[in-house]
Regions:
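Small-residue-enriched hydrophobic alpha-helices in membranes
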Residues: 1-139
Length: 139
């Protein structure tokens, strides 16, 4: 249906989170909560409304339904983000994966795809992953 050709940077960040959340058996309540909380609190989303979040999420889901949706989404994310926001995108994706304690193997696989598509330094990616794990530890 959609043949998305571009996203604005905030939409690309949302799309990155949705990719990870949708990787498993569906988007969990904890993943929705994390995505919503991040959009409300992370400075890169300043001025990004709940309505825009809903629209961007729907666009990302539709994109994933395309025949080559995952690869297309990866390219769109990469092409829509300035280099300075690529680590931010990966950090947001890790936060979503951490919402389920990195237990969903499909989400972890998508993180690998995102990391590769964004050409992140492996040490930087590992530090971002470890930071997300540390924030989501439970007693």
């Amino acid at each position: 249906m959609l043949a998305e050709t571009s996203l604005d940077p905030q939409e690309a960040l949302v799309c990155t989170m949705v990719l990870v959340a949708a990787a498993g058996e569906g988007i969990t309540d904890s993943e929705i909560g994390v995505m919503s909380g991040l959009v409300q609190t992370v400075p890169v989303f300043r001025g990004f409304s709940a309505d825009r979040l809903a629209v961007a999420t729907d666009r990302a889901v539709e994109l994933l339904r395309e025949a080559d949706g995952l690869a297309h989404a990866g390219r769109l994310i990469r092409d829509s983000l300035p280099p300075r926001l690529r680590e931010t995108a990966y950090a947001l994706a890790c936060e979503v994966a951490a919402a389920d304690f990195f237990e969903d193997r499909a989400s972890v696989s998508i993180l690998e795809l995102v990391r590769d598509e964004l050409a992140l330094d492996p040490l930087v990616a590992a530090a971002i992953e470890r930071g997300a794990r540390a924030r989501y530890q439970v007693v």
